[in-house]
Design a protein with these regions (language model features):
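Catalytic core of soluble alpha/beta enzymes
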Residues: 79-226
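N-terminal capping/lid subdomain adjacent to the active-site entrance of alpha/beta enzymes
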Residues: 1-102, 107-109, 116, 120-123
């Protein structure tokens, strides 16, 4: 039996061992008994697009939509906020919020001083949410944004290093975000992810699961774990 408590501070190793133990238990790459693992059903996923020029981004979005994606995540904070805002407006001019759900990830690019104004401007574009608007570790500032922002906030990097159940409860109660984003290799493996989900749901905080540059073995485990949830 895997001692998950000993490995709490090493989430990537923990996730790898959880996957290996699951493979050993099932004797198959079908790690869970679900319709998805049996090839009978799919799971909804988003398409990821990095910021670029108008034509390139529009082309990429059209490609994603042609492939069946209706939820697109865009990285922001790299090419200048005004340019990124213009690109998002350009996208919305072509695709309504009914046609495509847009999520953005700032990776902590905003400062506490200007974050609220940027969030207000982004909210005008009918976005679903923004991940990590300011860098991690600024709990008071993040809590203020989560309470007052017109655009729902999702925590990502904020969760890294918060590995105990007590720590998870403390963080979620202090910041009270609208969403959390779970990456098993960074946020406690599968067992740690389940703890995050349980604590989030007690507080009516939404959540979703994603990846962090894993191999196909890791992506397989993440996708199959996702499929265990309704």
């Amino acid at each position: 039996e895997l001692d998950t408590d000993v490995l709490r501070d090493y989430p990537s190793i923990l996730f790898g061992l959880e996957t290996a133990f699951r493979h050993l238990l099932t004797g198959s790459w079908a790690l869970y008994d679900t319709d998805f693992s049996q090839g009978k059903a799919g799971i909804p996923i988003n398409g990821l697009i990095w910021m670029g020029d108008f034509d390139t981004m529009l082309s990429r979005i059209e490609e994603k939509m042609a492939a069946g994606f209706r939820c697109i995540k865009l990285k922001i904070g790299a090419i200048g906020f005004e340019d990124e805002l213009a690109l998002l407006r350009h996208i919305r001019a072509h695709f309504s919020s009914r046609e495509i759900e847009l999520r953005v990830d700032a990776n902590g690019a905003f400062s506490p001083a200007d974050a609220m104004e940027k969030l207000k401007r982004l909210s005008e574009l009918e976005l679903h949410s923004i991940e990590q608007p300011i860098r991690a570790g600024q709990w008071e500032e993040m809590a203020r944004l989560a309470a007052d922002s017109p655009l729902p906030i999702a925590l990502d990097e904020e969760l890294i290093g918060c590995n105990t159940p007590e720590g998870k409860r403390k963080l979620l109660s202090a910041i009270n975000p609208q969403y959390i984003v779970l990456k098993p290799s960074l946020h406690g493996g599968i067992c740690g992810g389940n703890e995050w989900i349980a604590e989030a749901e007690k507080r009516h905080i939404g959540w979703w699961i994603t990846s962090a540059l894993e191999s196909n073995i890791g992506l397989n485990a993440i996708a199959q774990w996702c499929a265990t949830f309704d």
